[in-house]
């Protein structure tokens, strides 16, 4: 009997799974809000220099006489005249600049508060020479996500999924709330970094805890559900940001609910699969019997005993004798190959995704409308992705999503700027494909890595995604060399990464691997084709040690039938 059979015995997809999955994925509604929150809290309204304090604005011309014009006839945002230019025809916008001397905005700025009454940009004057600080805040948030993926992925394999989730909810609640009351920009950035760390842990452990409690045939459904909840969060952000335009109120509104998530997360049940892989058979039995009671299978739960579990989960128990580490991803040839291929997929998906979604003001239309459209396209995209994942498999779904996204972005690079409808449509389509790619890569990664290193592998994958999200804004600077250069780069990377999927095995209908031995035995044909399967007599010392204490996988009848 394998672990999947034990899950079926205690109720399969019963009341417990329905309740826990719902409660675990609910915080993802607000995780989407945090990831793109600065599109609204750091929006840049129209602005221009404030005249000197002693300026007489009651005379004919008023404010206009202090503002030079750019080539489009609009007031300069970062310059003002050193003295009023009374004789120049600024009011009709025909004079481009004038001959007066100019200076920076030494007395501050006047902002158009009609759309964005209050943002971190207007509060701390993050414009002109300080404009880069706005991007710094988002980059530091992504650095936090990067650190969180590494730290909490590792801790989840050591301490368990439940404990780390509880900590992450509390950290998000506290740091997000403190960011809303930050007295200055450096403190705001520090708390945003801490929020990013915690949200990375929530993202990783949400997927893993749910997948490890679900039977094989429902894992794709869970992955797709998580993706849809994240997409709904994008709708939620557009509505909430429109209703609450003040950045401090908005920051608080998307952070305070995590206090409630922290409270109810104490009732989560830790993954029995993680308990067994850690060698804690007593806790495995207790968790399974508790789930059986919740699912109305008390009698089936009573049939379980320590002896039954020892016979059924001998492999997980022997696994507990060897502690996997992040270095295992590089020592073992099979895991190293997985790590390198999956890292490329994670990086490419995140790199192109954030290249599109973090420049909403660049579309020239309502930022709230674009946010809704970007959220709406996820729904059909992820539905199609789900159908492909469940019918054709994870590998073709991942390849198609990245390839189509890259093609859409590349086409945008050659379409003229005045074709705004076509360009926007392609960007939306590309964003939908990248959202489907994220959905697939989360599920695919969790199914490829063995149990004892699964969360570490997920954490390293998410780490590479955060590297992509940090590098992505830097690529936008290449537009100074050639306007379409960023789009060519954003498109070429996912197209190239899509080819990597042919080097990975298919996981559709397969039980989760618990050891490296499981992975190698199922992946032998793919490894041989790729030329990475270790030849006889060439095993490393680490692999030989694994063979001493790992028993072969004995698939149950249900698993052999893909159930």
Curated annotation (Swiss-Prot):
Record carries keyword Hydrolase: no
Pfam family, one: Sugar_tr
Effect recorded for residue 438 to A: Decrease in the level of membrane protein expression, 70 % loss of PAH uptake, increased affinity for cidofovir, lower Vmax for PAH, and lower Km and Vmax for cidofovir
Main location: membrane
Impact after mutating residue 39 to Q: Complete loss of PAH transport activity
Extra remark: Involved in the renal transport of a variety of drugs with well-known nephrotoxic potential, therefore may play a role in the etiology of the drug-associated nephrotoxicity. Uptakes the diagnostic agent PAH/para-aminohippurate and clinically used drugs. Mediates the pH- and chloride-dependent bidirectional transport of PAH/para-aminohippurate in exchange for 2-oxoglutarate or glutarate as counteranions. Can also mediate PAH/cGMP exchange.
Outcome of swapping residue 36 to A: Complete loss of PAH transport activity
One GO location term (cellular component): protein-containing complex
Catalytic activity: (6R)-L-erythro-5,6,7,8-tetrahydrobiopterin(out) + a dicarboxylate(in) = (6R)-L-erythro-5,6,7,8-tetrahydrobiopterin(in) + a dicarboxylate(out); L-erythro-7,8-dihydrobiopterin(out) + a dicarboxylate(in) = L-erythro-7,8-dihydrobiopterin(in) + a dicarboxylate(out); L-sepiapterin(out) + a dicarboxylate(in) = L-sepiapterin(in) + a dicarboxylate(out); prostaglandin F2alpha(out) + a dicarboxylate(in) = prostaglandin F2alpha(in) + a dicarboxylate(out)
Protein name, as recorded: Solute carrier family 22 member 6
Side of membrane Cytoplasmic, spans: 1-9, 157-164, 214-224, 270-337, 390-395, 447-455, 506-563
Protein family: Belongs to the major facilitator (TC 2.A.1) superfamily. Organic cation transporter (TC 2.A.1.19) family.
Species of provenance: Homo sapiens
InterPro entries, per database record: MFS_dom, MFS_sugar_transport-like, MFS_trans_sf, Orgcat_transp/SVOP
GO molecular function: alpha-ketoglutarate transmembrane transporter activity; antiporter activity; chloride ion binding; identical protein binding; organic anion transmembrane transporter activity; prostaglandin transmembrane transporter activity; sodium-independent organic anion transmembrane transporter activity; solute:inorganic anion antiporter activity
Membrane side Extracellular: residue ranges: 31-135, 188-190, 246-248, 359-368, 417-425, 476-484
Subcellular location: Basolateral cell membrane; Basal cell membrane
Site residues by UniProt (Important for interaction with cidofovir and PAH): 438
GO biological process, one term: renal tubular secretion
Gene it is expressed from: SLC22A6
PANTHER family per the UniProt record, alphabetical: SOLUTE CARRIER FAMILY 22 MEMBER
Glycosylation positions in this chain: 39, 56, 92, 97, 113
Site feature location: Important for interaction with cidofovir: 230
Outcome when changing residue 30 to A: Complete loss of PAH transport activity
Keyword set, alphabetical order: Cell membrane, Glycoprotein, Membrane, Transmembrane, Transmembrane helix
Superkingdom as given in the UniProt entry: Eukaryota
Cross-referenced NCBIfam families: 2A0119
């Amino acid at each position: 009997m394998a672990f999947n059979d034990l899950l079926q015995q205690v109720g399969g997809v019963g009341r417990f799974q329905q309740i826990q999955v719902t409660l675990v994925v609910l915080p993802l509604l607000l995780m989407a809000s945090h990831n793109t929150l600065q599109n609204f809290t750091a929006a840049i309204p129209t602005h221009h220099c404030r005249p000197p304090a002693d300026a007489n604005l009651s005379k004919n011309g008023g404010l206009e006489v202090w503002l030079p014009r750019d080539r489009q006839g609009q007031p300069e945002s970062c310059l003002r005249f050193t003295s009023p230019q009374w004789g120049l025809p600024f009011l009709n916008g025909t004079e481009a600049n004038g001959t007066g001397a100019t200076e920076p905005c030494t007395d501050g700025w006047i902002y158009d508060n009609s759309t964005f009454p209050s943002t971190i940009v207007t509060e701390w004057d993050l414009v002109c020479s300080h404009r880069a600080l706005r991007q710094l805040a988002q980059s530091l948030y992504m650095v936090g996500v990067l650190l969180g993926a590494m730290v909490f992925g590792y801790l989840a394999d050591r301490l368990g999924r439940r404990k780390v989730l509880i900590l992450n909810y509390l950290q998000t609640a506290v740091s997000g709330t403190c960011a809303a009351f930050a007295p200055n920009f450096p403190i705001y950035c520090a708390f945003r970094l801490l929020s990013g760390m915690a949200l990375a842990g929530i993202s990783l452990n949400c997927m893993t805890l749910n997948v490890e409690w679900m039977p094989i045939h429902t894992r794709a459904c869970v992955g797709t559900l998580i993706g849809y909840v994240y997409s709904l969060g994008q709708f939620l952000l557009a509505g909430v940001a429109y209703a609450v335009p003040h950045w401090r109120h908005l920051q608080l509104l998307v952070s305070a609910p995590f206090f409630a998530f922290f409270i109810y997360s104490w009732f989560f049940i830790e993954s029995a699969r993680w308990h067994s892989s850690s060698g804690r058979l007593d806790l495995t039995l207790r968790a399974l019997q508790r789930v059986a009671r919740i699912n109305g299978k008390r009698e089936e739960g009573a049939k379980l005993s320590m002896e039954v579990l020892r016979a059924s989960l001998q492999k997980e128990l022997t696994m507990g004798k060897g502690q996997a580490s992040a270095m295992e991803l590089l020592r073992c040839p099979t895991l190293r190959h997985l790590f390198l291929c999956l890292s490329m997929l994670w990086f490419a998906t995140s790199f192109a995704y954030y290249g599109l979604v973090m420049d909403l003001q660049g579309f020239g239309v309502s930022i709230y409308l674009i946010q809704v459209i970007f959220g709406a396209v996820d729904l059909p995209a992820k539905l199609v992705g789900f159908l492909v994942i469940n019918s054709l498999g994870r590998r073709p779904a991942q390849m198609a999503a990245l390839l189509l996204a890259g093609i859409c972005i590349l086409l945008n690079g050659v379409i003229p700027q005045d074709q705004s409808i076509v360009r926007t449509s392609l960007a939306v389509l590309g964003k939908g494909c990248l959202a489907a790619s994220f959905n697939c890569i989360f599920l695919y990664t969790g199914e490829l890595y063995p149990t004892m290193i699964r969360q570490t592998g997920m954490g390293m994958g998410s780490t590479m995604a955060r590297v992509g999200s940090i590098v992505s804004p830097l690529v936008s600077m290449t537009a100074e060399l050639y306007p379409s250069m960023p789009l060519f780069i954003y498109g070429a990377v996912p197209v190239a990464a899509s080819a990597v999927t042919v080097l990975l095995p298919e996981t559709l209908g397969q039980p989760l691997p618990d050891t490296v031995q499981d992975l190698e035995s199922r992946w032998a044909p793919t490894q041989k084709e790729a030329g990475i399967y270790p030849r006889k007599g060439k095993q490393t010392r680490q692999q030989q040690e694994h063979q001493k204490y790992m028993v072969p996988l004995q698939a149950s009848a249900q698993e052999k039938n893909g159930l």
